[in-house]
């Protein structure tokens, strides 16, 4: 009898210890045939979780994608209401014809074609290329940067969604860049809109000149892979957002090239930086639209229309010239135009 009581007590203690253990983590495994699982199977490892093999399924990135879609639809509705609202005294057709008759639209279309060709061939430098040429054509820094950022809202939004769908976005890197980048963009847009264009123009041109030299310097760099988490990402995002808004471009050359230059994975770095760029471009475009006013809309239309026809030219450049030659050419053109803009600012 006593032995039975001892056995019963031991069994009760064992059951109690089992019930007090923390529950095992429920893992959402990806059991499909894919490259990662094939590698794990060869090494005798278990399948990866679904969030690893399909990063676009992460709730944070799904929310980001829906936010991009919602904001793009809202912008289209706003622009349509502004264009066809009879309260402005003119019909939408009249406004379109007036824009097409002006030289501003066609100059901006040529700039948009060139800048989007460069961006399509190199994957960056749309902002600094278009801003450099707009400044040379006589636009003020605020109007040039405002036009570029408003035009970029749609391209960066579509690009960001594409990168998420292709699994090119690192959630942690995206979140670390997002808020600092937006704060920097707001501060930069307010700064360039608040200072007289004649005063700030030579400084913006000097910044673009340095960016041209920076692009040229990439021709001579060799990148070594680095799997460690990048440091000072928030500071980099804040600085990149600020100079991007002030100079009309630079988020990609500053942030992407800095992170990739330290050895970070190019695929997820480019995707994460592109997705974050939409949100900082959006907030800076709002600030510019409030502070600059109606001035940039013909330039915005020209940049967008010109950029629509750039794809075949970008493909041709990519096929005929290697990336190093393109970098050297683009960096040289931006630097030369910036020197010209500095000369004009002081004469």
Write out the residue ranges for each language-model feature.
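Transmembrane helix-bundle signature of multi-pass membrane transporters/permeases
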Residues: 145-153, 270-278, 308, 334
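Short, contiguous, pocket-lining structural segments
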Residues: 247-250, 274
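Juxtamembrane transmembrane-helix boundary motif
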Residues: 2-115, 120, 132-137, 141, ...
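Early transmembrane hairpin of solute transport permeases
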Residues: 128, 132, 136, 143-156, ...
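Feature detects amphipathic, helix-rich regulatory segments
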Residues: 271, 284-287
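Membrane-embedded alpha-helical segments of transport systems
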Residues: 150-158, 183-184, 191, 275-283
């Amino acid at each position: 009898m006593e032995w039975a009581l001892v056995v019963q007590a031991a069994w009760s203690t064992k059951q109690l210890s089992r019930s007090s253990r923390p529950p095992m983590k429920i893992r959402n495994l990806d059991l499909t045939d894919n490259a990662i699982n094939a590698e794990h199977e060869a090494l005798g490892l278990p399948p990866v979780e679904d969030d690893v093999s399909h990063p676009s399924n992460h709730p944070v990135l799904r929310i980001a994608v829906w936010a991009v879609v919602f904001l793009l639809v809202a912008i289209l509705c706003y622009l349509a209401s502004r264009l066809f609202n009879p309260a402005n005294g003119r019909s939408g057709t009249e406004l379109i014809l007036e824009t097409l008759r002006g030289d501003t639209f066609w100059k901006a279309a040529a700039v948009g074609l060139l800048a989007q060709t460069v961006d399509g061939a190199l994957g960056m430098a749309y902002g600094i290329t278009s801003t450099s040429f707009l400044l040379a054509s006589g636009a003020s820094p605020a109007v040039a940067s405002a036009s570029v950022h408003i035009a970029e809202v749609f391209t960066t939004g579509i690009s960001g969604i594409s990168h998420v769908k292709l699994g090119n976005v690192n959630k942690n890197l995206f979140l670390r860049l997002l808020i600092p980048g937006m704060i920097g963009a707001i501060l930069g847009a307010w700064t360039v809109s608040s200072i007289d264009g004649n005063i700030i123009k030579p400084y913006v041109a000097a910044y673009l000149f340095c960016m041209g030299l920076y692009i040229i310097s990439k021709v001579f760099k060799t990148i070594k892979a680095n799997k460690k988490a990048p440091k000072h990402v928030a500071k980099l995002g804040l600085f990149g957002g600020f100079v991007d808004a002030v100079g009309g471009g630079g988020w990609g050359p500053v942030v992407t090239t800095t992170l990739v230059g330290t050895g970070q994975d190019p695929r997820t770095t480019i995707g994460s930086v592109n997705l974050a760029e939409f949100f900082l471009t959006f907030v800076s475009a709002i600030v510019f639209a409030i502070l600059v006013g109606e001035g940039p809309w013909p330039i915005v239309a020209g940049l967008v229309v010109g950029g629509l026809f750039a794809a075949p030219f970008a493909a041709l450049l990519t096929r005929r010239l290697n990336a190093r030659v393109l970098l050297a050419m683009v960096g040289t053109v931006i630097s030369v135009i910036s020197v010209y803009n500095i000369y004009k600012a002081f004469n």
